[in-house]
Design a protein with these regions (language model features):
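Enzyme catalytic cores with a strong preference for nitrogen-chemistry domains
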Residues: 1-350, 366-375
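ATP/NTP-dependent adenylation/nucleotidyl-transfer catalytic domains that generate, transfer
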Residues: 161-163, 218-220, 232, 253, ...
Length: 634
């Protein structure tokens, strides 16, 4: 696969011999030899060249001199194009510092010094080490007659990949304002932590959350390498708990292997920094040294990163149910607030027996419970037409009865036929006029009934339909409050299913609705009375379209990258099918913006929303050529 912006990182915990840098050198080099050939960065634990648990041996010049010598030897034996971050003690200006050496292409780029030196409970580091705050200004370290910067305010910028590395050491992360936070403000998008974090009850969970959350706050990749069980067990146990996170997501975590890998997506991180500007506002104005280096380009990679085919839907069922019910509550709270603000106790909603209108009805029912309104104020209207099937009509009626709402059936057949006569349309011609006339007739009925009941019309269309423009302009496109507007189709099904799993009374009808093919039912049924017009046969799978939508709107990836990621996520789907779907997606996304620019109010529930008043602002006549050309070249 094309490299795109992926940066392959590794965290490694070698076996250590306490106080024996020569033996540790062999272990470190052994680990480096075992690395995948396309690894670009490897991070080792705190003080890995000597061992973290040397205690008063750190006073021994024999150990300190050997550690420095071993560092130089390792640097000379490093493979090309690999950044290695190694921990060791260094004596500088008659003080001992806990340091990380950043090494690349037989050179030392810089020395990062630990800032926060713990001296509490089991930690006693201030006995041996000084803080980076005690360094003299412009301190340097000599290597090959070259002055190497020594500081706690250095970032290392790779001009080839856009990776910018910031290093911190163990405790530097556990404080109120971590060192990595100022690194991020200085441009670091990959943060590395050399750690010696011991194990006590529940500390692993705390550590995991700490690393994960810091990667999220900094919009960064975070590589955490910790000392392992070969450290001294005189008083403590070290497990080698290594983590690689990206923007709040754990990409990899130590299980049994001493080396773990993570492919960091730099484009995604850089986009979020560009988009969420307040997070990158530097109010500290710390002076930083930037060390530039240039790696060799890597054009093709073995792609090992997990790509979720359903990015809107949690994989774990328990988590999914909790998330779905939370979304339902947010939707309902939005509607409840709107009704309360406008002093309205009635809503009108069209019910088809499909997923979207089912979810919207459930939202109305929940909103009425929040406001303590009578459910009879929900006026649920079924409007059978030329394409209505027995299954959907029956499910609609059962659901309305079980929810104890006011239900009414109004056929649109006579009204639409009269309309066909008025506009001189042949009802045997099943074209766009035939379909949209029905949608607009239904909307007219709902709007007029809302006047009659002093109510508002609740819209049922979802996020995926808005993305594709799969709605009739001024038909089902229009309402007075659109409760599903930021819920994608793949998630709608699971929200309805989650309610079914929690409600025995509604279970059977909701599960049958979930199993019903997605259709606007604007064309006549087949000869067996079943749905003939199936949306996904026309547009392509909503699974694919929601995937494209997420990658485009959340990460703003280019079409070619989205296509390649889709091929990874949907490996059982033919590539030609994916290509056909993505062509449809981009064509419709650009041509249908005019519908989104005048969409009704509706509450935002997730990270993606099309409200022209908030998240998505785009001219209706923008050119699609740049995007569709790239798609056509796939």
């Amino acid at each position: 696969m094309h490299r795109y912006s992926y940066y392959k990182t590794a965290a490694c915990t070698p076996n250590v011999s306490i106080g024996d840098p020569q033996a540790n050198k062999e272990e470190i080099l052994k680990c480096i030899q075992e690395l995948d050939s396309d690894t670009q960065l490897v991070v080792f634990p705190e003080l890995c060249i000597t061992g973290y648990t040397c205690q008063d041996l750190f006073y021994e010049h024999t150990l300190l001199n050997k550690a420095k010598q071993v560092l130089f030897e390792i640097v000379e034996e490093l493979p090309e194009n690999l950044v290695a971050v190694l921990g060791l003690p260094l004596e500088i200006d008659n003080k001992l510092y806990n340091c990380a050496a950043i090494c690349f292409n037989h050179d030392i780029l810089g020395i990062q010094v630990k800032t926060y030196i713990p001296s509490y409970n089991e930690f006693y580091e201030t006995r041996w080490f000084s803080s980076a705050s005690e360094l003299k200004e412009n301190t340097t370290f000599t290597y090959k007659n070259k002055k190497v910067p020594v500081s706690n305010h250095i970032v290392f910028k790779d001009s080839t990949t856009s990776a910018c590395l910031g290093i911190e050491i163990c405790e530097d992360l556990w404080v109120t304002i971590p060192v990595s936070s100022t690194h991020a403000l200085a441009g670091a998008n990959i943060l590395c932590n050399l750690s010696a974090s011991n194990e006590i009850i529940s500390k692993a969970n705390y550590r995991r959350n700490l690393v994960k959350d810091q990667s999220a706050k900094c919009y960064a990749g975070y590589i955490y390498a910790s000392a392992g069980p070969t450290e001294s067990s005189s008083d403590l146990v070290f497990s080698g708990h290594n983590l690689i996170c990206e923007n709040g997501v754990v990409l990899n975590e130590t299980k049994t292997d001493k080396i773990i890998y993570g492919q960091i997506d730099l484009d995604h991180l850089n986009h979020d920094r560009l988009h969420y500007k307040t997070s990158m506002q530097d109010l500290f104005h710390v002076n930083y040294t930037t060390v530039d280096f240039a790696s060799k380009p890597i054009h093709e990679i073995e792609f090992t990163r997990y790509i979720d085919a359903y990015p809107f839907v949690p994989n774990n069922q328990d988590e999914r149910i909790v998330r779905c019910l939370e979304i339902l509550h947010i939707q309902a709270q939005g509607l409840a607030t709107r009704l309360s603000k406008i002093h309205c106790k009635d809503v009108v909603i069209g019910i088809s027996g499909g997923l979207d209108s089912t979810l919207a009805l459930l939202v109305c029912h929940e909103a009425f419970k929040i406001n303590n309104y009578d459910s009879k104020g929900i006026h649920a209207i079924t409007m059978p037409g030329f394409g209505t099937t027995k299954r959907t009509k029956s499910n609609a009626q059962i659901l309305m009865d079980l929810l104890h709402v006011s239900s009414e059936e109004i056929s649109i057949v006579d009204g639409v036929n009269q309309h066909f006569k008025d506009i001189h349309h042949d009802p045997e011609v099943h074209n766009i006029t035939y379909e949209n006339s029905q949608a607009r007739e239904r909307t007219q009925i709902l709007m007029d009934l809302s006047n009659a009941y002093n109510a508002i019309v609740v819209g049922t269309g979802d996020l995926s339909e808005l993305a594709l423009g799969w709605c009739t302009y001024n038909g089902d496109h229009m309402s007075m409050y659109a409760v599903n507007a930021s819920v994608p189709k793949t998630l709608v099904r699971y929200i309805v299913e989650s309610v079914a799993l929690k409600d025995e009374i509604l279970h059977d009808v909701l599960m049958d609705i979930c199993d019903t093919p997605v259709s606007p039912e604007l064309l006549p049924p087949d000869k067996n009375g079943k749905i003939a017009q199936k949306t996904e046969e026309v547009l392509g799978s909503y699974d694919l379209h929601d995937f494209f939508l997420y990658q485009m709107l959340r990460h703003h990836d280019e079409p070619k990258k989205i296509y390649d990621l889709a091929c990874v996520a949907f490996k059982d789907v033919e590539k030609e099918t994916i290509k056909k779907a993505i062509v449809t997606f981009y064509n419709r996304f650009f041509t249908q913006q005019f519908k989104r620019n005048c969409m009704p109010d509706g509450v935002k529930v997730g990270s993606i929303c099309f409200s022209p008043r908030g998240d998505w602002r785009m001219p209706s006549d923008a050119s699609r050529n740049l995007w569709t050309k790239q798609v056509e070249e796939i």
